Amino acid sequence: MLGADIEHYLAELVARLDDALGDRLVGVWLFGSGALGDLDPATSDLDVQVVTTVRLPRAERERLAARVSHPELPCPVRGLELVVYACDDLRDALGPAFQLNLNTGPRMTQHAAYDPAEDPRFWFVLDVAIGRDAGRPLAGPPPAEVFPELPAPLVLASLREALAWFAANDRKGDQAALAAARAWAWAE
């Protein structure tokens, strides 16, 4: 359990997603530190993955982003990282291709991307590689029933890209060390 305020937030998030998507919603899963048991509300994000049966029109994705963005839905931790995929896009040769990547919250910069070319793909490869086994269902089946097992060479290339990104962008090394530990755990 993540605490009553976080659990309530996740329940409201799922309710809004279900209301907006209806029978096109395959499921909603908590990935990342929230699922792995090391969430720190001051510094962590809630990493939530959503899968739909079909690709949604851009205007609908924009409305969905507005409906779940902070402060419309106040986030009780640093932020929400919400990624929405269509089933068919999970098996893209370059790695899972999102239809919405939303970062929103009281202590993070608002970011919404609607094309997988807008953000580095390695983030999504690593999230799916780890989360398919360690994710927590918020609605729908266990993640391994929906998220594919990704090819090891793709995941290893993504790990190298992530470590290079952290070397260039995380001068203190805090997040790089955490990412390296998670990568090591996946590799074992």
How should each PLM-predicted stretch be described?
Residues 160-188:
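Hydrophobic alpha-helical packing segments in soluble, helical-rich domains
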Residues 30-66, 70, 79-84:
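Catalytic metal-binding acidic patch
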Residues 1, 66-170:
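Conserved NTP/Mg2+-binding pocket subregion across the NTase superfamily
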Residues 11, 15, 66-69, 185:
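Surface-exposed alpha-helical segments enriched in charged/polar residues
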Residues 1-29, 59-61:
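Helical scaffold of the NTase/Pol beta-like nucleotidyltransferase catalytic core
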Residues 35-36, 89, 182-185:
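Short, solvent-exposed loop/turn segments at secondary-structure junctions
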